[in-house]
Amino acid sequence: MDAPEQSFLREKSLAVEDQELAVGTLEDSHAAKPETNAAIELPNKSKPEKSAVEKDREDFREAVVKTLDRLLFVHKSFDIYHGVAGLYDFGPHGRTVELNILSLWRKCFVDEEDMMEVACTALTPEAVFNASGHVKKFTDLMVKDEVDGAFHRADHLVKSYCENRKKDPTISAENAAELDKVIAHVEDLSAEELGGVWNHCSTAPVTKNPLSHPPRPFNLMFQTSFGASGSLIGYLRPETAQGSFCNFKDYYNLNGRKLPFAVAQVGRVFRNEISPRQGLLRTREFTLAEIEHFVHPEHKSHSKFSDVAKLELLMFPREEQEKPGQFAKRLCLGEAVAKGHVNSETLGFFIGRVYLFLIRLGIDKERLRFRHHLANEMAHYATDCWDAEIECSYGWIECVGIADRSDYDLRAHSEKSGHALVAQEKLAEPIEVEKLAITPEMKELGPAFKGNQKNVVEALEVD
């Protein structure tokens, strides 16, 4: 969709929203029927035009997909055996495109920022993901078609229902706003919260068969085992980051025991999606390029932030998303950091560098926005997070995640492994600290506590 079409669609969307608000106001004020019907008429006229644009998107997408398949840019894996959903191969042209993208990525980040590039194994012991939280929290909620056995993501069904419900020209502005809230938060709703709207989504979208209830969690990691006995459980990694965290001490020492430093990694990752869809946008195996930037937690300024501070980006802060009818707006990156929308110069620097990389890659800046995660959708490890989203025929799609993970991962692996994954700071002058120390009188404790004496001594030693 080119810029004029995009502008046209937004104008029509706003017209529909404004007029639906007017309809709701007239209905609430018990206006005369002819006046209310006249107000309803504009949304009904506008919606077919909007649908025509959406139809053009679908036709264009179908033509592109067929061309990419015919020219072997990308095609379904093991197609002679009918393939498996979510698995794709790159042909010669597709592989060349991938290599060119990764080459530019290395030039823009690894080379320019003097990062360490490493390659860690994809097979990972269970203990690693127990520590990181992935075993418990890397899940989606699913339901089952009780007739044909097909599985569906519960949040996708709820989102689809809400989007279709919003197309009803008779819906009130208040109900539309409530549906918008559900759509914005749907991927983060608990099974109980999804159950609150489940009576509207109790049948499968195509077969209309009944669906299981309530939704149950499904872990997205592929489980495996090591060795002949199968007693040591492992997983195929869903992200490359955990290898970098577990090896932190080695990289820190290699960097002269100095902060900050960054570790980059490109590799295959695996996610057992419940219902892969949207072609290459949701697959079960794909290439991920990640950077872990380690910085002093109390010194998150960045020496090169001034290089990107004046960039004006389409940004969608959390506060704006929580207001009805708002869109992303152009903000100066320096201003976004100064106002606290972005929590530090370091995070702001990488937002700016991602923007410059994507523009250099050929992404239209009018179709590129940075969306702030809402508080309820933040990952369990994040203190702040922004997504670079690109507008395509499927709408706004997340392509890059930029998160402040704080010390979550290093602290978790330190506690579980018993190895201190920490950095040390040399102070210009020593800091004197007064500490209350309890020195137990053992000859008094023995008679008083007898067999519990050891437990009492250990309790007194706790800071």
From Swiss-Prot:
GO terms for biological process: diadenosine tetraphosphate biosynthetic process; glycyl-tRNA aminoacylation. It catalyses: tRNA(Gly) + glycine + ATP = glycyl-tRNA(Gly) + AMP + diphosphate. It is found in: Cytoplasm. ATP binds at residues 271-273, 281-286, 398-399. Residues 44-54 have a biased composition (Basic and acidic residues). InterPro entries: aa-tRNA-synt_IIb, aa-tRNA-synth_II, aa-tRNA-synth_II/BPL/LPL, Gly-tRNA_synthase/POLG2, GlyRS-like_core, tRNA-synt_gly. Its main location: cytoplasm. Its EC number is 6.1.1.14. GO terms for molecular function: ATP binding; glycine-tRNA ligase activity; protein dimerization activity. Residues 25-54 are annotated as: Disordered. Homodimer. PANTHER family: GLYCINE--TRNA LIGASE (PTHR10745:SF0), GLYCYL-TRNA SYNTHETASE/DNA POLYMERASE SUBUNIT GAMMA-2 (PTHR10745). Catalyzes the attachment of glycine to tRNA(Gly). Is also able produce diadenosine tetraphosphate (Ap4A), a universal pleiotropic signaling molecule needed for cell regulation pathways, by direct condensation of 2 ATPs. This is Putative glycine--tRNA ligase, cytoplasmic.
